[in-house]
Amino acid sequence: MCIRDSLVRGVQDVCEKYGYSVLVVNSDDIQEKESSYLKLLYSRRVDGVILTTAGYREEEEFPKEELLLLKKMNIVLIDREINGMTTPIVKVNNFGGAYSAVKYLLAMGHKKIMYLAGIKKTKTNQEREKGYLTALREVQINWKNELAADFRLDTAFQKIVQYWSQLKNSDDLPTAIFSANDLMAIGALKAFAQLKLRVPEDISIIGFDNISFSDCTYPPLTTIAQPTYLMGQKAVETLLKVINKQKIKKSIELETELIERDSVGRWKVSR
């Protein structure tokens, strides 16, 4: 998950209200950097940590040393769970967001919708995949296809170019893509530009996250927005309860919102 200005702002606003200062560190989704920063935060005896774990772990599992360190600190997670811990988490309804994305594509006339997947074993990806499959199943569409990537822009770009180059003008190509995150959706936009395919005339794309530059792409990306400012606020409120040993909800799930831009078009041609 990219660190987003609105999420950090939500954290800062609540912390300032209660007299806490904020130290922000960014792992760039690199596990080694994450481990190093956690050791640094522990050594500085911070009151608590709001953590979005590095996203490219196959099974969202931590090395034992890192897991022991986490258990010594006051922790609240955002977005990604950790196996082996009952840590409180603030997340979004990933199933519901994915479901609404695919229902939107269906309403726009698309019947061949590909799922551009993240890391298969992560809970985030699994919930979004379930939403995709459920939306198709409800309208009895048997055509489904999944292209596995890893949440990264460059990987999605390479996978799309390879897939479309192999099938070329096949009737089995999708007319729309639901991407498990915006970075991969942007990688797909880049790939289709190279393949000289028009978005949304030839292929439609919808992402998930509404990252800060998703409206700066060409065309601007239609996506599912996470309420990141509210997530930051809820994470701090929960962390303060953890610090003060008050009763907490172990999981806070927030709803998503469809943001309509220009990367999805109505499908008019029957394949």
Predicted segments with their positions:
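Alpha-helical recognition/docking segments in bacterial nutrient-uptake
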Residues: 3-103, 107
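Hinge/beta->alpha junction and helix N-cap segments in small-molecule ligand-binding domains
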Residues: 4-6, 24-33, 55-58, 80, ...
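Short acidic/polar active-site loop segments enriched in Thr and Asp
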Residues: 47, 111-112, 175
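Short beta-strand segments enriched in small/hydrophobic residues
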Residues: 50, 112-118
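Flexible loop/turn connectors
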Residues: 144, 161, 165-271
